[in-house]
Amino acid sequence: MWPQPYLPPHPMMLEESRQNKLAAAKKKLKEYQQRKSPGIPAGAKTKKKKTDSSPETTTSGGGHSPGDSQYQELAVALESSSVTINQLNENIESLKQQKKQVEHQLEEAKKTNNEIHKAQMEQLETINILTLEKADLKTTLYHTKRAARHFEEESKDLAGRLQYSLQRIQELERALSAVSTQQQEEDRSSSCREAVLQRRLQQTIKERALLNAHVTQVTESLKQVQLERDEYAKHIKGERARWQERMWKMSVEARTLKEEKKRDIHRIQELERSLSELKNQMAEPPSLAPPAVTSVVEQLQDEAKHLRQEVEGLEGKLQSQVENNQALSLLSKEQKQRLQEQEEMLREQEAQRVREQERLCEQNERLREQQKTLQEQGERLRKQEQRLRKQEERLRKEEERLQKQEKRLWDQEERLWKKEERLQKQEERLALSQNHKLDKQLAEPQCSFEDLNNEKKSALQLEQQVKELQEKLDEEHLEAASQRNQQLETQLSLVALPGEGDGGQHLDSEEEEAPRPTPNIPEDLESREATSSFMDLPKEKADGTEQVERRELGFVQPSGVTDGMRESFTVYESQGAVPNTRHQEMEDVIRLAQKEEEMKVKLLELQELVLPLVGNHEGHGKFLIAAQNPADEPTPGAPAPQELGAAGEQDDFYEVSLDNNVEPAPGAAREGSPHDNPPVQQIVQLSPVMQDT
């Protein structure tokens, strides 16, 4: 069995173990601090007991002698001292327990310190191992740098996309009409991005699963290779033992053969000596030798031949054994080379396995980083979608608000059209009635003179009452404008004021909506709109002043007409009933009738203006105080109640005016009765005069 290489622990595992140990140490420190902190003192209850028992002693001491009171005080003092002693004993015991706990905690802290020291030693070992793996990490750093560059490029692309999305959001905020289409496009793009992200996630999950499967396959193959290596090593060890035994046997046989060879060589040498001696003897002069000697010589020669043959056989055996030994040595060398090659292959496989594991770890880290980036991108897209949805809701609310405003404007226009139709009908009716009256006046000129005198009086009364109403309306407009300015300065928001309208038809709607209270500030309005509305306030003030001046001109015109009527009356009285001037007088009468119609229309408009002012304006009390002074004191030239008509006729006229004009606000329905408001009473008093004329 070859020794397996020591693999270092993963740095992430080391960091996790370190963090876990630090968290455990922090928890122990917190527990130690909590135990060390002093608890609630037990003397509070005793103090309460003292306070509870003190009134009893005082009450009981009121009826006894001073000696008893001193005795009781001493008893109380003894009780309090005993209680304090008990408390001190309890505190001592608690301090002892705390001391034990502190000692126990110190022991635990020592243990934790030892564990930390061991962990530090392990970390030092891992650092040494990591220094050995520095060469491999350089290659991984190169790959990580390339990946970081790639991620930087992707981050730049994402930053550009974010800028583009911000520009799109600004465009959405600017234009309401283009928001819907752009929003649909962005929804489509976001859905496409989500689909792409989901595909990427699925691909990464699949790749991760494939990598895990590949890792499992590699680990299984490594296990199989290790098993095969172990089996092959066992087989090689067995063969080595066999070859060693055979080599030992062969070496033993070679030694025995060498010894036999030496013996044979020694015998051969002895035989050669003996042969040489015999040859020498044979070389001597022949003598009669016995046959025994010849036979001995022949035997010796045969033995020598036999020995030579044995020596030759032994030499062949030796050569064959040497050749076998050489072949065995070659085989052993080849087997050693094979074993070395296999060991190198196994080492290379182990190194490849380590590299593959490192590469898989790097790939897993990259996949985790990609998943994190994808999750961050998804969160960003979700946040963008939420922002866009909020903006859509705001835009929808603004659209709804604009639609409501449009509906209100349409309703106001419809009301104005209805008013115009009603006024036209009233004008037609008045024209018909005036034509009938003119016919009667032509038939009876004397009655016409009396009527003209009455009209003159009524015109003077109208002038005075119109002036008073004009002053009151001016005060009302100024108060309303000042209140509106104060509210706008405090709130710094947009006040929804009605438009100027087209011509004289929309003046009534402007004057009706002018004194209404300011609406609540909408939350969706931007600061630019608020500042622009605040800068437009002087323009609105100027428009209000122009409207007041127009009304003043409208009220000044009937006064001029009455002056003309007076002049015509003086001329008529000076000339008398001349037939040539009758035609001019009739023309003057017609003109007066037209001016009276205009006065009636303006009075109706004033009535429509005053009713919402009285009902909805916040400074109604000031208006009543300013209006009750002329109501209590009769003005010079004002007609008596008998001349103006009965109260029933006034009520009838009030009901007709409300039916024919705009419906009053709920505040006007509560507070706008003609008997409670002096300006309304004056307008109602003017109405029967106009009916009489």
UniProtKB/Swiss-Prot annotation:
Pfam families: GOLGA2L5
GO biological process: Golgi organization
Keywords carried by this UniProt record: Coiled coil
Signal peptide start and end residues: none
Biased composition (Polar residues): 679-693
Recorded family membership: Belongs to the GOLGA6 family.
Protein name: Golgin subfamily A member 6C
